[in-house]
């Protein structure tokens, strides 16, 4: 029996996918720009 792969953690979620994590890299800033251009209500986790 395999374990469930999603083990929720608010801290890890924010650190990996949060706004500041996105802003920290050039690629992450591109992600935010793309989501803004598309008109996303939520830009990041």
From Swiss-Prot:
Keywords: Ribonucleoprotein, Ribosomal protein. GO terms for biological process: translation. Disulfide bonds: none annotated. It holds the Pfam family Ribosomal_L34. One of its GO terms (molecular function) is structural constituent of ribosome. Coiled coil: none annotated. One of its GO terms (cellular component) is ribonucleoprotein complex. It comes from the Bacteria. PANTHER family: LARGE RIBOSOMAL SUBUNIT PROTEIN BL34M, MITOCHONDRIAL RIBOSOMAL PROTEIN 34 FAMILY MEMBER. NCBIfam families: rpmH_bact. Belongs to the bacterial ribosomal protein bL34 family. This is Large ribosomal subunit protein bL34.
């Amino acid at each position: 029996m395999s374990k469930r792969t999603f083990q929720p953690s608010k801290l890890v979620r924010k650190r990996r996918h949060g706004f500041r994590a996105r802003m920290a890299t050039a690629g992450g800033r591109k992600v935010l720009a793309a989501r803004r251009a598309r008109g996303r209500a939520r830009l990041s986790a």
